[in-house]
Amino acid sequence: MSSDIQQIRIGLTNNHPCSYLADRMERVAVAIDPQMQTPETYEVLMANGFRRSGDTIYKPHCDHCQSCQALRIPAPDFVPSKSQKRLLKLLSQEFHWQLKPELDEDWYTLYARYIFARHRHGSMYPPNKMEFAKFARAKWLNTQYLHLYQGEKLVAIAVTDLLPNSASAFYTFYDPDISISLGTLAVLCQLNYCQQTKKQWLYLGYQIDECPAMNYKVRFNPHQRLVNQRWRG
């Protein structure tokens, strides 16, 4: 643990089937001290591998698996790949984004279409407004919604936590009928925001190499992974 937080009280959940790897069991450590729930402390906790779901701050604590690795991008040093440069060009020509404190009125239609098309067998199914609000918001955190538009059409929303020196890509949903990589485009917008506001890091959550749906994260370079409590990369 960073020297900024010497001790933290945690509680452990029971083992249950992993949401990402079918043959694994998962367990998480949950921070149970309310004083941990501040933007400044949460930023330190993220640098030590923690993440949030709603107001709950947690970290994987599995008995026989270390596949989850926190991943972050040093925003000032980011160098787009050829395919990312093409997306950035498309962004300047056809798309625009805006960070908002609240969701657009038509957000749920987009969210429901995304869940039905991409996550029918996941924990977010069936889509539910109240459950999404509990999942996406933390009362102690500045959470903003990055809205991505193609012309006037809303095509993606990236829930983004803003911390003193970093941002966290919390959850993204998008139009499942658009063929370009809207998830990658949303991350490029978040990186753009970090660079504009001089934030050092964009956290992308956990990377699991065995999970193909997550492998878009490692295409952002340079990036760092938290391995054995050290950031490497």
UniProtKB/Swiss-Prot annotation:
Q: Name one GO cellular component term.
A: cytoplasm
- Please report the name of this protein according to its UniProt entry: Aspartate/glutamate leucyltransferase
Q: Which GO molecular function annotation, any one, does this entry have?
A: arginyl-tRNA--protein transferase activity
Pfam assignment, any one: ATE_N
**InterPro entries linked to this entry:** Acyl_CoA_acyltransferase, Asp_Glu_LeuTrfase, N-end_Aminoacyl_Trfase, N-end_Aminoacyl_Trfase_C, N-end_Aminoacyl_Trfase_N
Q: PANTHER family in the record, alphabetically?
A: ARGININE-TRNA-PROTEIN TRANSFERASE 1, ARGINYL-TRNA--PROTEIN TRANSFERASE 1
Please state the Enzyme Commission number of this protein. Answer: 2.3.2.29
Acyltransferase found in the keyword field: yes
Q: What does this protein do?
A: Functions in the N-end rule pathway of protein degradation where it conjugates Leu from its aminoacyl-tRNA to the N-termini of proteins containing an N-terminal aspartate or glutamate.
* Database matches in SUPFAM superfamilies: Acyl-CoA N-acyltransferases (Nat)
Alphabetically sorted, this entry's keywords are:
Acyltransferase, Cytoplasm, Transferase
Alphabetical GO biological process terms = proteasomal protein catabolic process; ubiquitin-dependent protein catabolic process via the N-end rule pathway
Can you state which reaction this protein catalyses? N-terminal L-glutamyl-[protein] + L-leucyl-tRNA(Leu) = N-terminal L-leucyl-L-glutamyl-[protein] + tRNA(Leu) + H(+); N-terminal L-aspartyl-[protein] + L-leucyl-tRNA(Leu) = N-terminal L-leucyl-L-aspartyl-[protein] + tRNA(Leu) + H(+)
Question: Where is it predominantly found?
Answer: cytoplasm
Q: Which domain of life is it from?
A: Bacteria
Q: Does the keyword Cell cycle apply?
A: no
Family, according to the entry, reads as follows: Belongs to the R-transferase family. Bpt subfamily.
Name of the coding gene: bpt
